[in-house]
Amino acid sequence: MREGDISSPYYRDLAFVTYMGMTALDSMLAAFGKRDDISSGGKQMPSHFSKREKGILSQSSPVGTQIVHGVGAALAVKIDNKPNIAIATVGEGSSNQCDFHEGLNFAGVHKLPFVCVIENNKYAISVPDSLQYGAEKLSDRAIGYGM
């Protein structure tokens, strides 16, 4: 990723947001709800990462919603004619939510500069991946959206 790219991570993405520039101090201030938390002044839930100057969008709690946030950011990038991308990350369980499908469909129809990364955790809470999707690979879902 490069400067100006936008990311919409999910709550398990501590390693990703650290790579994107969040510090251990940033994470601890957020986790302990401290006033100096750069994301929200201590008002956001733990693991709801954001850092504006690094292009990390704030997230909402329901899984899968980071997809539509990322797709919206990709639409803004396209409208502004910028050379950047937007990326959203989800677990395989989130890829079964309506926000995931609606977001990918919109991104595909409008040919947006959007990347979706699905982290296959093998279980969505208590459901094994063998009972979550019928495709051989999760990436095969992109074909249906013209990606």
Language-model-detected regions and their locations in the chain:
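Short, proline-centered helix/strand-breaking motifs
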Residues: 113-114
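Active-site flanking residues adjacent to catalytic metal/cofactor-binding acidic residues
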Residues: 91, 118-119
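Short, ordered loop/turn segments at secondary-structure junctions
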Residues: 12, 119-122
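A short acidic, helix-capping loop that chelates divalent metal ions and anchors anionic groups
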Residues: 124-126
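Cofactor-binding active-site loop characterized by glycine-rich and histidine/acidic residues
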Residues: 1-110, 128-134, 139, 144-146
